[in-house]
Amino acid sequence: MPKKILFTGGGTVGHVTLNLILIPKFIKDGWEVHYIGDKNGIEHTEIEKSGLDVTFHAIATGKLRRYFSWQNLADVFKVALGLLQSLFIVAKLRPQALFSKGGFVSVPPVVAAKLLGKPVFIHESDRSMGLANKIAYKFATTMYTTFEQEDQLSKVKHLGAVTKVFKDTNQMPESTQLEAVKEYFSRDLKTLLFIGGSAGAHVFNQFISDHPELKQRYNIINITGDPHLNELSSHLYRVDYVTDLYQPLMAMADLVVTRGGSNTLFELLAMAKLHLIVPLGKEASRGDQLENATYFEKRGYAKQLQEPDLTLHNFDQAMADLFEHQADYEATMLATKEIQSPDFFYDLLRADISSAIKEK
């Protein structure tokens, strides 16, 4: 009988990416892989799109809020139903372990696995834990973290960032689409790539639309999340979504303007790519991106600009400063020890699963 592992995590692409890195490795080693998530969530979309041999199990999910809302009452019942569904799934499958990447949907499967005596491994990408992982930590066997946590927690293993970016651009797949884009760009201009993510692209889209003069100063690549904005014209490439083209576009850019999500930040760090961080504020998030951005700026990896300060004047000043000190930023990023390979983490996780099973 093949070994089985359950994955969970969703709500944003960031809560799925690491799972999609690990899953093929388990499949290659003969494991049967199952995924618990929201059928209407990004996790189901990404699993379907991946084409991986994964069985998806849908559960009810409710949002966990730190503030009062009448929706909390309805969501209590959704979470309770999700827990019952998760208990049934875990009891039926009897997996060797569960791995969670976080997000609201992950809490019921984590609790269910713990109640049924299954080892639970969770991962936290941000400088501080979100509410879902604060709850999940209580039920976890081990928590792996990208950042060193300020609180000394007994079940935490500081891992660093796990990323599969190509450090050698020659390894990247060739793209005829990329060649077509280059024909519209000027070799005399720096190329900027704007990455807003699923929650933060709108501000960048509006900034570029409001300031057409940017196209006279730079070649602009704008990942918009909105197919209505798709455009390829002189010095401008706007595209709603990219997959295989993502890393080639990052490599093509002289500088990346990004939000403060940890996955993208550490991909840029792994590539030693010059970048400006415009983090989501507390009005649009729990403040984790502000913490991530400050962490990167203090270590000399990047410069940050707060969203309310994103004016053309401030943007131009930030660009000038980054390009003037480009060599210093790149040297600091190249010297980092905060990046781990997927193989390293997979081997560590496999070893920890084996140890947890033996200790039962």
Curated annotation (Swiss-Prot):
GO terms for cellular component: plasma membrane. It is a peripheral membrane protein. Its EC number is 2.4.1.227. CDD domains: GT28_MurG (cd03785). One of its GO terms (molecular function) is undecaprenyldiphospho-muramoylpentapeptide beta-N-acetylglucosaminyltransferase activity. The keyword Cell membrane applies. Pathway: Cell wall biogenesis; peptidoglycan biosynthesis. Its main location: membrane. The keyword tRNA-binding does not apply. Keywords: Cell cycle, Cell division, Cell membrane, Cell shape, Cell wall biogenesis/degradation, Glycosyltransferase, Membrane, Peptidoglycan synthesis, Transferase. Cell wall formation. Catalyzes the transfer of a GlcNAc subunit on undecaprenyl-pyrophosphoryl-MurNAc-pentapeptide (lipid intermediate I) to form undecaprenyl-pyrophosphoryl-MurNAc-(pentapeptide)GlcNAc (lipid intermediate II). Belongs to the glycosyltransferase 28 family. MurG subfamily. This is UDP-N-acetylglucosamine--N-acetylmuramyl-(pentapeptide) pyrophosphoryl-undecaprenol N-acetylglucosamine transferase. The lineage of its organism: Bacteria, Bacillati, Bacillota, Bacilli, Lactobacillales.
